[in-house]
Amino acid sequence: MAPAWSLLLALLLLSCNAICSLGCHLPHIHSLANRRVLMLLQQLRRVSPSSCLQDRNDFALPQEALGGSQLQKAQAISVLHEVTQHTSQLFSTEGFGAVWDESLLDKLRAALDQQLTDLQACLRQEEGLRGAPLVKKDSSLAVRKYFHRLTLYLQEKRHSPCAWEVVRAEVMRAFSSSTNLQESFRRKD
């Protein structure tokens, strides 16, 4: 009887190890969710970008954090989470609802919340496999500083419609870069 239990236990441990070693694979549906967020951000455009040319600014999008070749998959998940979280916080800011259609904002927030839930589950899974937090401090700090610059810009411009348009376009750029990063890792899998 003992050898049968030993065999079952060994098979269970091997199958768990095989499943756990797969790591976090963001499903194709998550990629579609990213595209949905980009589509919603595009639909939010209310001001012609050409009328806001004088308001444009270089916010120094952290390309190394969003697409650097040195970024490992686990760290990329952390960066994707950071970008999504800051985007969600930015579009939950008080006092800008008058600029955009509230129903579109609700859809955007819901899509971002779903992505955060997916990414948090992924982070927990990856951290469980590695036993340590995944955050690469340089990348995380670069993303936080980038979104801080966007927030300061909005305050400086008093949340004007043109300022929000510039920020909306900039967030689309950041989100597009994070989507490209995610898809590059998905192709490698």
Swiss-Prot record:
It comes from the Eukaryota. Residues 1-23 form the signal peptide. One of its GO terms (molecular function) is cytokine activity. InterPro entries: 4_helix_cytokine-like_core, Interferon_alpha/beta/delta. GO terms for biological process: adaptive immune response; B cell activation involved in immune response; defense response to virus; humoral immune response; natural killer cell activation involved in immune response; positive regulation of biosynthetic process; response to exogenous dsRNA; T cell activation involved in immune response. It is found in: Secreted. Pfam families: Interferon. Disulfide bonds join C24-C122, C52-C162. One of its GO terms (cellular component) is extracellular space. The keyword Secreted applies. Gene3D superfamilies: 1.20.1250.10. Keywords: Antiviral defense, Cytokine, Disulfide bond, Secreted, Signal. The keyword Disulfide bond applies. Belongs to the alpha/beta interferon family. Produced by macrophages, IFN-alpha have antiviral activities. Interferon stimulates the production of two enzymes: a protein kinase and an oligoadenylate synthetase. This is Interferon alpha-F. It comes from Bos taurus. The gene is IFNAF.
